[in-house]
Amino acid sequence: PRAYSIAGERGLSYVFTTDDTDTDTHPNTVDIRMTCLNGRTFSVRGESLGGGKVRISRIDHIDVDFSGEYSTLIIIHHDRLGVLAHITRCLSEGYVNIAFMKLFRETKGDRAYSIIEFDGSLPDHMVSRIYENPDVQDVMFIPVKGENENGF
């Protein structure tokens, strides 16, 4: 209920528009297009499933599938040998217990998305540790409410 005032307090600007042309989507779907301070833009599609449950179904133009019920890492990287091993090694060294993990890619050798849902919190240094691999382009951390709030 306070979303608008919180957004204003944090300096976020927003615009709502409707799209009546896309008739193949779930009726409770929202597409969010974001521009970061560094100018990078990306979009996220989410669906309200009812009962307080949501599903994220797209990031940029890649179909994904995760619930937001767990703390989540979204890692955008090049589809190259060893990147996934680097990510899981970092998480293992930080004692992060993976609940669900999915990898999506645009095309072989191009951009890939690793979606990692896990139990508990994320050590403070973990995002910077994952960035140490030169093929990692972006790391976003979405904490579950009540966990550490180091968000992206």
Question: Where is each model-derived feature located?
Answer:
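A conserved regulatory-domain signal marking ACT and ACT-like small-molecule sensing domains
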Residues: 1-152
